[in-house]
Amino acid sequence: MTKAALYTLTIATAIGTGLTPVPCCAYALDAQLDCKSNAHAFIAPLLTDQYIDPKPMRVEANSVNAFRPAQGSNLTAFGFRVYAVLGYEHGDKMFKQGSGQPITDSAYGAVVAGSAEDVEARVREAGSDAVVRQVIPLLLTAIFCNRQ
């Protein structure tokens, strides 16, 4: 191998290593998705620590607010990358009201990249009783805690 080729390979490896996500720096939401909390307690620390954008990217008619993970936040849930963080708590100024009837007094969760079957298996393995629903087949799945 020539000196130039070796140098190019070394630089490419160094750059690639620097751009690869580091699993040790990911912030896992597993413990909070045990469904023993409320939306305010779930969302507030994520906003304070700037893991999610403060303005919801979407507010559903049932008042569920979808927050986008902040750039570089590396949020995970049960080992899956988080696409969106969900939440709504009645009477809490942190959440915007939708146009329809609110889903419940307090609900929270996450949308992750993974199939519903794989996500459900990991959620149950962790002992959570969260509701797991397919959003986009084989791509996105919602993990949802709904307190009545």
Predicted stretch roles:
Residues 8-18:
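Bacterial N-terminal signal peptides
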Residues 19-26:
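Sec/Tat signal peptide C-region and signal peptidase I cleavage site
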Residues 38-52, 112-127:
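Amphipathic alpha-helical segments
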Residues 69-126:
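Long, charged/polar, surface-exposed segments that mediate recognition or autoinhibition
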Residues 123-148:
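C-terminal partner/receptor-binding element of secreted or periplasmic proteins
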